[in-house]
Amino acid sequence: MRPSSVSPYDLQDWAKRAGFELAEETLHPLAGYLGLLMQWNKVMNLVGTRTAEDTFFTLVVDSLHLGRFLREDVKCSAAPCCWDLGSGAGLPGIPLRMIWQEGDYWMVEAREKRALFLSTVLAQYPLPGTHVFRVRAGASLWQGLQHGQRILSSAGRLCRGPVFWNSSKAA
């Protein structure tokens, strides 16, 4: 699919109106992502908004707020590993990773077409440490995690800032 056109200049204007200054190197990939999202949305209904501007102000701006919070308020003693369960349209993940690239970020999506969308975006706009994992966020995911590090259960011990989710059963 050919992406809809989103102007980086419009994107910079929208960001300024929302209280953000986007780096030059972020504008083109973020505009490209929004264009792809709008194009795929016509066929797959990824988001409820119908224009790139509405999508920016109702959805993408949340990613920018989250990125600001993570940069300014959360201090981790080790590189974080984030799991975005039910990533769908790549929100908040893809815009977030365009402005905050600490550690690893896994977008977990069960639906094949949505996982394909996420993979397509990452193929066109590579984001370091950002991955798509197509699996249901249930038993299969937890079994896969058991073979790796206990990322989720140790998150509270790694961060010196606020803890958002600690899945460990033992205190």
Write out the residue ranges for each language-model feature:
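Conserved class I S-adenosyl-L-methionine
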Residues: C76-G88
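S-adenosylmethionine
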Residues: G103-W106, A110-A171
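Class I SAM-dependent transferase core
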Residues: M1-S77, K113-T130
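Acidic active-site catalytic centers that drive phospho-/nucleotidyl reactions
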Residues: D62, D84, E109
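Conserved SAM-binding loop of SAM-dependent methyltransferases across substrates and taxa
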Residues: A89-E102
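Active-site phosphate/pyrophosphate- and oxyanion-stabilizing loops and adjacent acidic/basic residues
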Residues: L64, I94, S153
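Residue-level signal for inorganic ion chemistry
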Residues: L37, L96, K169
